[in-house]
Each structure stands twice: as structure tokens, then as C-alpha cells.
Amino acid sequence: APYVLWILFATYLNGYILVKNPDNKIVTQNVLTTNIDTLSNSKNRQTMKHTLPQLPYKTEALAPKMSAETFEYHYGKHLQTYIDNLNKLIEGTPYAEMPLDEIVRKADGGVFNNAAQTWNHTFFFLTLTPDQQPMPEKLAAALARDVGSVEAFREAFTKAAVGLFGSGWTWLAQQPDGKLVIVAESNAGNPMTRGLKPLLTVDVWEHAYYIDYRNRRAEFVKNWWDLVDWQKVADRL
């Protein structure tokens, strides 16, 4: 059985289920691109504007599990607003020259919220696919080693996502010691702030599912599983 650790923060709970983390190499570039996993090579410290990521699929391609209308609002409006707010907030500050992941790790207040939501949403959208392939063996083996089985992981992750009070994100991440971790984060929370490496996330803010599912978060999470790009998740190990 996985080792479970609960940490109380102020007025909300973040649930940890310890289940794997080499060195962190996710995002270290100022501009969002089509592949968040390749953003670690930029050493430029010049000021750049954050922009919407280009999606590797058409916005209608995930329907009916995720409709084009949901993408119009979730991707085209909500994410765009976070990006616009971030660009305004960091203009003329040291954050304007920082990679996005560095902003997430160092900032607080409004800068953190908008930077983290920009990072989180980009990561979420770029881990979806209309053509899901079987989970690669190395990921399945890691989950079996640390959680017991792939099914046990899905059950624990689903419970964390559906049970998260209010808005937030549920993550599969890697610890520095190599264990996989399920982290339930409220609001704009991101496991990079704890020294963890994100592998997978689901957005459980209401704007992620309300158009298609109204208040049926559990149904949204159930259908989201069919849209996960397991190869991308495995490549992050």
C-alpha cells in the first residue's frame, strides 16, 4: 500500500500519496511553445511575452469528452486571461527575464497565481491526446512498484481529484528520491514549489468541466482518463 502523508496549510489540505524523481527539467524558457517538456534549454534572460501554447490537436478533436466550446472558454479565454495578467504584472520587474518555472518557484501573490495557472494549464493541455495509446511499460512498472498497480494509481488519483475541496489541480509528480507522488493542490498550486517534478495533472477548477458536465466532476475525471497522452507522461520519468 502506498505511504500517505497529509500536510495542512492554513485553511486547506494538500494530500500526498507517495508513489518517483530524477533532476527537474521541465520548463526553463520564457515563451510557451508546443511542447512544455522541451523548454529547459533556453539560457536567454531577455524579456519576452508569454503567449498561448500551440496545441498538437484540433480543439474539436477531444469531443465529446471535452467539447470545442469548452476549449473556446478554457483554453481561449481563461488561459489567455492568465497569460495577459502575467505579462502585465511582470513588466518592468525581474520576473520579466525569468523562465516561467522560475517565476512559479519564486513568486507569490498575483504574480504566482497567474504564472502558476499559465504553467499548469499549458501542462494540462499538452498532456491530452485524441489518439490515446497504451501506457508504456516503464510507467506501468513504476506505478506497480510504488502504488501496487496501475488500477490502484487510477483509483487513488481519481479519489484525490474528485475529493479536492473547491478549485485546484491533482498531480502525479516525482520526488528527488525517485518515488512517484500524487499531490492534490488547491487553487493555483504546483508541485514544483515543493521540489517535485510534475508528470501529469488534471484541472478540477469548475471552468474545466462546467460547460460539458455542469457539476459532475466525477464524470469529467472519468472521461479525462481516456484523453491522457501516456507516452508524454512516461517520457517525463
What is each residue range found by the language model?
Residues 1-39:
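Polytopic transmembrane helical bundles with strong interfacial aromatic enrichment
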Residues 44-237:
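Feature for soluble, non-membrane regions of globular proteins
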